[in-house]
């Protein structure tokens, strides 16, 4: 089953969209800062956003506490779930021995919004070197076709005060960072 996530770049400040979401009955229920570091040994040229994610080992630190969670373990010898700040250099050395190099080092601030009855959250993300984006996926739509999922997500965002069209493309974060220019597609999980 393929899942659609939309992620549209926004052109006004966070406070503007915070106000719109709140005026439409949503509450800001969660905020965090995230630091993600991606490593790969594969050629990422021509890949989709999701394919890039699948080709990378990711370290994730939320709110700059304690250390980094290790995600997408592509190395069999990598039996590590978590590393501290002090262990990053040693971890990167092990990755380098296996041909993995750092390809992305990105920080973002997440702001999640929802209201009673919602099965998902609208996410406003302030992503360094990219800007402010709004993200949404909804598991209630997963059984629909890709186009139907996308249209439902756009309709849902518009019901919260946005004004997107079905023809609008979302911004792909990793592809944008990789190519150092904005890259767009219909599915930020595709």
Where are these regions (language model features)?
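A short, polar/proline- and glycine-enriched secondary-structure boundary/capping micro-motif
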Residues: 78-83, 134-135, 145-147
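Glyoxalase I/VOC metalloenzyme domain signal
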Residues: 1, 11-17, 129-133, 151-156
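Generic hydrophobic secondary-structure signal
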Residues: 57-59, 122-124, 133-134, 156-160
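Mixed-charge, glycine-accented linear interaction segment located at domain edges/termini
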Residues: 141-173
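Conserved, surface-exposed functional patches that form binding/active-site neighborhoods
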Residues: 104-143
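N-terminal strand-loop-strand beta-hairpin
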Residues: 1-119, 163-190
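General N-terminal targeting signals
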Residues: 23-25, 74, 130, 139-141, ...
């Amino acid at each position: 089953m393929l899942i659609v996530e939309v992620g549209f770049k926004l052109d006004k400040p966070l406070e503007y969209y915070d106000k719109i979401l709140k005026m439409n009955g949503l509450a800001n229920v969660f905020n965090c800062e995230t630091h993600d570091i991606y490593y790969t040994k594969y050629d990422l040229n021509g890949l989709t956003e999701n394919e890039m994610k699948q080709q990378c080992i990711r370290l994730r630190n939320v709110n700059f506490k304690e250390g980094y969670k290790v995600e997408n373990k592509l190395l069999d010898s990598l039996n590590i779930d978590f590393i501290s700040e002090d262990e990053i250099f040693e971890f990167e050395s092990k990755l380098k021995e296996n041909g993995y190099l750092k390809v992305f080092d990105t920080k973002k601030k997440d702001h999640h919004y929802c209201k009673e009855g919602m099965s998902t959250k609208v996410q406003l993300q302030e992503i360094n070197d990219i800007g402010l984006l709004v993200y949404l996926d909804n598991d209630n739509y997963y059984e629909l076709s890709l186009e139907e999922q996308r249209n439902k997500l756009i309709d849902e965002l518009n019901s919260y005060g946005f004004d997107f069209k079905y023809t609008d493309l979302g911004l792909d974060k990793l592809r944008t960072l990789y190519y150092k220019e904005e890259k767009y597609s219909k599915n930020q999980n595709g």
